């Protein structure tokens, strides 16, 4: 290409690529001097990426282009999580399922099994309830007791199943069942009221007419399971209808990422997990910890994590934990 004008005229045909050039088009050098190609799949382990830029600089558009090229040229499927509804464009382009999370129509049960061991699963559910409660269940004596009691209630429920990994969303215990079991725990006079009060607090938020009951209390109605498939096609998850409630949005991000992480353990097929506006998870420290833990799993299973954010400070926090 000898001029920018000619490049614009030929843009529908794409860039010419030398046979020795490996990878797909990722963008242009500064000043549009030359195209940049990159192959993310040379190594057995995936390479994660963090994109940073202020609003309006084309991060989301660039992400759509990247996912489109990887899928169209290399057949690399992806899971896209985005908060603004722009995912509809890429879903329409490929005829993909577009999952829109809604406070009124969506249910995501916190007790859905996302981890292979009981200890990991209980820790995951506890993290979700910490986010719902807006406080940590550790540190001081009372909080430590609350954490132990909640963990005991969850263990009682999960031990009722012979195989944890075969607990389907239809069988997973719901929030009201957790509260019922929790309210009856405590082997000493001092711990009984703590268990009862914690159960009442969770029930007031997640059951009955609680602010998050419609979203959290019930069987999950979004298909997040692998369902015996050898390959999962690309999926697009949009969270724009949860924009008014940042806690619900963060919880939805976490449950979807948890399901993706769970399925990533099964095979080493290359896949891209793209999380747009990752700062929405970073508002909640326990959920940020989960993202960092998941990223380490993704890499060893050839799953590339692409985090898109507006804050360089947030990105440094993620990089510091992954390096």
Region roles according to the model:
Residues 3-36, 42, 83-303:
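P-loop NTPase motor domains
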Residues 51:
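Hydrophobic anchor at the beta1->P-loop junction of P-loop NTPases
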Residues 55:
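The conserved Walker
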Residues 59:
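Conserved lysine of the Walker
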Residues 62:
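Hydrophobic positions on the alpha1 helix immediately C-terminal to the Walker A/P-loop
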Residues 69-79, 94-96:
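Post-Walker A helix-loop "phosphate-sensing" segment adjacent to the P-loop in P-loop NTPases
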Residues 96-100, 318-323:
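A short helix-turn-beta junction within AAA+ P-loop NTPase domains corresponding to the substrate/partner-engaging
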Residues 298-315:
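Sensor-1/coupling segment of RecA-like P-loop NTPase cores
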